[in-house]
Swiss-Prot record:
Boundaries of every F-box domain copy: 1-38
SUPFAM superfamilies for the chain: F-box domain
InterPro entries registered for this protein in UniProt: F-box-assoc_dom_typ1, F-box-assoc_interact_dom, F-box-like_dom_sf, F-box_dom, SCF_F-box_component
Name of the protein in its database record: Putative F-box protein At3g22940
PANTHER family listed in its UniProt record: BNACNNG10540D PROTEIN, F-BOX PROTEIN CPR30-LIKE
Length: 412
């Protein structure tokens, strides 16, 4: 068997050790055509990153001729030293091979990681805002400027507290990898509302969320999607979802970094749609799958709060879920109907559903800070920062929520 074919079949976690063995092999792993060949060598295999019990797992799913599936996976670690205490992760977001990791026990560190290269970049947020039980009130997204391929992180808190009355916490900010600076975005009267806990998915550099009109009924489910354009650093208009009935809860996923998928679960039907055209200001949908299910016996309703994965070629959808009696599970659905579930084991954390995102190895290099070339914050940005911090401090004095601020904020 030729050397290239042998190396192309290596599991991702072994490539770093192999590359360090020989310069010729290292240069081979940097070749784009070789990366494509390696992906093709795994035909029939769907690869994804799954977050369970605050640990990341690189998981491969091998689909049979029907909805049967074989699962193989191992934990992957940010730490190079396997003997050291591993970093615990509370959230993970994916953008073309890069993972944005939100840490469980460190409110003042974000990590961007390329598992293929083993590269990391640690980033300091400017402040942290939590409610009791340690719930991070911020939402996150990672994307890039399509003109310069410069990566950025969007971080925002947009939440209305009913006690104390009439307190709205609203702060959108963006981190630029080139400048190594956080900047407050001009978002003062948003026309959209992204429900707390709603996860965005990044596609072709931009991030999409399920959303609804700002002044709509509090208990109304999301009936639109909205895009944040990392090039213009602005949100687009609300775009309609394709469903005629929105009684079910909707969630989004990315299909091999090419399309967006939307899943809605009603009482007895699961629908999945995928995009045939998607831009910041326009989206067209095509129905991918409709499966009749019996929620009473087979699928618990809590699955709608989990995440899902689509294999477009195999015409299969997998929904990740958590139940009290069975632990973490994957529900398999295809054209033939509901194909049953796969047990992922008993979790330590009984409350959190496993999170999943599709994964394709990437040659993208994570930019490092420019060092002495680093830009200074503008006077306007300093004033905006002080104003937002003052608002959060005022809220803290009226409530039981905890506000803590980094002593290493990027104010110059």
């Amino acid at each position: 068997m030729p050397l290239e074919e042998i190396l192309s079949r290596l599991p991702l976690k072994s490539t770093r050790a192999v590359r360090s063995t020989c310069k010729k092999w290292d240069s081979l792993f940097k070749n784009r055509s070789f990366i494509s060949k390696a992906a093709a060598a795994r035909e029939g295999e769907s690869q994804m990153v799954v977050l369970m019990d605050h640990n990341l797992h690189l998981v491969s799913f091998f689909f049979g001729s029907d909805t049967s599936v074989e699962i193989k996976g191992k934990r992957i670690c940010l730490n190079d030293d396997s003997d050291s205490e591993q970093v615990k992760i509370s959230q993970v977001f994916h953008c073309e091979g890069l993972l944005l990791c939100i840490l469980k026990d460190d409110n003042f560190s974000l990590v961007v990681w390329n598992p293929y290269w083993g590269q990391t970049r640690w980033i300091k947020p400017r402040c942290s805002f939590e409610i009791p039980q340690g719930c991070d009130m911020y939402r996150y997204a990672i994307g890039y400027d399509n003109k310069r391929r410069n990566h950025k992180i969007l971080r925002f808190i947009d939440y209305e507290f009913h006690y104390p009355r009439d307190n709205v916490v609203l702060w959108y900010e963006i981190y630029d990898f080139e400048s190594d600076l956080w900047t407050t975005l001009d978002v003062t009267t948003p026309h959209w509302l992204i429900n707390c806990g709603n996860r965005g998915v990044t596609l072709k550099g931009n991030t999409y969320w399920c959303a609804k009109k700002r002044n709509s009924d509090l208990f109304l489910n999301a009936d639109h999607i909205i895009c944040f354009d990392f090039t213009s650093e602005r949100f687009g208009p609300l775009l309609l979802l394709p469903f005629s009935d929105l009684d079910g809860v909707v969630t989004l996923a990315c299909v091999r970094e090419e399309k967006l998928a939307a899943l809605v679960c009603h009482e007895d039907v699961v629908e999945v749609w995928i995009t045939i055209k998607i831009e910041a200001n326009e989206v067209l949908w095509s129905k991918f799958l409709t499966v009749n299910v019996d929620l009473g016996d087979e699928i618990p309703s809590s699955l709608t709060y989990g995440s899902f994965f689509i294999d477009e070629e195999k015409k299969v959808a997998m929904i990740f879920d958590k139940t009290l009696d069975r632990g973490d599970t994957v529900h398999i659905m295809g054209e033939a109907g509901y194909g049953g579930q796969v047990d992922l084991g008993e979790p330590v954390n009984k409350r959190r559903c496993p999170l999943v995102c599709s994964y394709v190895p990437s040659l993208v290099q994570i930019k490092k800070p420019a060092g002495f070339q680093r830009k200074q914050q503008s006077k306007l940005e300093k004033r905006q920062y002080v104003r937002n911090i003052s608002k959060l401090r005022a809220l803290k004095t009226q409530s039981s929520w905890t506000l803590s601020m980094s002593l290493e904020c990027h104010q110059q």
